Every structure is written in structure tokens, then in C-alpha cells.
Amino acid sequence: MLCPGHAIEAAWFILNESIFRNHDPRLKQLGLTILDWMLDWGWDQEYGGILYYRDVKNLPIQEYWQDMKFWWPHNEAIIATLLAYQITGDEKYAKWHQMIHQWAYQYFPDREYGEWYGYLHRDGRISVPLKGNFWKGPFHLPRMQLNAWKIIEGME
């Protein structure tokens, strides 16, 4: 079973580390390879957005949330694609960023009370109206916003 969100998060950690290590080409390539592979596997071709789990053999997922999309993989993908674009200049990452950003900001935000819903059905409908629980706290969303701001600021 694949969890695209965790792999995408790991990809941007590795890309960041490549920057800290004088733009280490091996780490950069590793981060980009993981990111490319997980974007291809994780993107829902039918409804858009990033699937929470994928089976490597394309078998049905047995988890009860198999038809859901969670907020945090989208947060991580927004950071990862923006960082990949910054360090490569490759337009494919700008396109991925735009696609993920548009999908996430179309479906996750609560336009009336703020914050993001954490759990959507595959088609983008709200599954659980909670915006905070044991698993969803104020971490991934503000981290994404802060990192995106810093990355964009570094591009100017």
C-alpha cells in the first residue's frame, strides 16, 4: 500500500536537504524522483485531488477511508511542487502546483467559519465536518502557508 502524502512530504524534506547541502545533485534527483512517482500514483484521474492510499497492485484498498481525501497530503504537495519548481525551473512542477492548489482551495476551506475541513469523499464532498480532532490539528495547513510564502519570497 502506498501513502502518497507521506512520500510527497518526504520528497520535499529531501529537496530541502539538497539545498542545505550545497544543492547536492543526488539528493535533488532522489527528491524529484519520489515526487514525480507519487504525483503520478496519487493524483485521482477521475475527480482530481490526491488519494489517501493507493495499492501498488491497483487492488481495492481495505481501509474504511479508502474513498477519502485528507487535507494534509494536499498541503504537503503544495509545498513539494512549489519547491521543486523553485529549484528546477521545470514548468511541469508549476502545473502540478497549480492543479493541486486549485483543487485543494476549491474543496477543503470552510468559507463561512474558516480553517479547512480535514476529510472529504473522493468527489470532494465533505465527509466529516470536523476541522479539529486527535489527528487534525493546526500543523500542516499553517506550515504549508508559511513554507509557500517563504519559497515564493525566495523566487522574487
What is each model feature region?
Residues 1-156:
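Glycan-recognition and catalytic cores of secretory/periplasmic carbohydrate-active enzymes
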